[in-house]
């Protein structure tokens, strides 16, 4: 049995706590809302974020970071990207020496343009940095909570740390693979939220399956293009954290990014969408960061650019779609063709 500190009492933190409890581990789930912690401890349910799912008595809620972290073998960071730095700063005085950090959030920090593992490296003491692990893949919390079959990927610079997390989570309902390509895993997980927003917009506009299929396919090309330029392995984007996560996020009503995009497609303004959602929509912040990354690495990302225009410059969604369809003609495998031609030269 391992002691696990789950930093974050949202839907994903709760669902992962359930997996860990099923595996016989003791989970201390930290959250800052006292009424939510009381729910978890007294009703054994998270009515706000994962209603209808009974939680094991081995999952204990706390609003005290020192209590959550005491003796923890693993520390799972399950808070939104924008809160990670603040939470880590508060946690620093209480981190046990033997702990392995795992992050399960999908995003990129705007302005700094850091992946989450890089952000964590800036905040954590040196002895913890080499063992940071990312757990990512096509995994809606609602389905994990119901113990539906789910597969994800564990990635780290240290393969032993990735394998330790694989062993920690893996069971008959929750299969975990390892992948040493941390860059590709994080970029795929973050950028799919952009394409999910766009997929929701096309559905909100009533454009049908043809448009969505094109969007997912060309969206994957954008993700792979940027991810490879940043040092990721191209093969990673055809795996669970690339095409797998993209499919599940672009086609499911469980996806908050898809739901937000759907509202945008139906004519809601961004502020109204975020207010109506009542939950973090990572794709909005990630769109800004990915647009900045596309400029930095000089990578063509037309879908990301179009969504950036809609979200931050007030462009109508119909106009954005028209601009995408009116782009100059090109080869579908443009990057491969250019690479081949350069080699021939």
Curated annotation (Swiss-Prot):
InterPro entries: 6-PGluconate_DH-like_C_sf, 6PGD_dom2, G3P_DH_NAD-dep, G3P_DH_NAD-dep_C, G3P_DH_NAD-dep_N, NAD(P)-bd_dom_sf. It catalyses: sn-glycerol 3-phosphate + NAD(+) = dihydroxyacetone phosphate + NADH + H(+); sn-glycerol 3-phosphate + NADP(+) = dihydroxyacetone phosphate + NADPH + H(+). GO terms for molecular function: glycerol-3-phosphate dehydrogenase [NAD(P)+] activity; NAD binding. Its EC number is 1.1.1.94. The keyword Glycosyltransferase does not apply. GO terms for cellular component: cytosol. Sn-glycerol 3-phosphate binds at residues 106, 137, 139, 192, 245, 255-257. Pathway: Membrane lipid metabolism; glycerophospholipid metabolism. One of its GO terms (biological process) is glycerophospholipid metabolic process. Pfam families: NAD_Gly3P_dh_C, NAD_Gly3P_dh_N. The active site is at residue 192. It comes from the Bacteria. SUPFAM superfamilies: 6-phosphogluconate dehydrogenase C-terminal domain-like, NAD(P)-binding Rossmann-fold domains. Catalyzes the reduction of the glycolytic intermediate dihydroxyacetone phosphate (DHAP) to sn-glycerol 3-phosphate (G3P), the key precursor for phospholipid synthesis. Belongs to the NAD-dependent glycerol-3-phosphate dehydrogenase family. HAMAP family: NAD_Glyc3P_dehydrog. This is Glycerol-3-phosphate dehydrogenase [NAD(P)+]. It comes from Bacillus velezensis (strain DSM 23117 / BGSC 10A6 / LMG 26770 / FZB42) (Bacillus amyloliquefaciens subsp. plantarum).
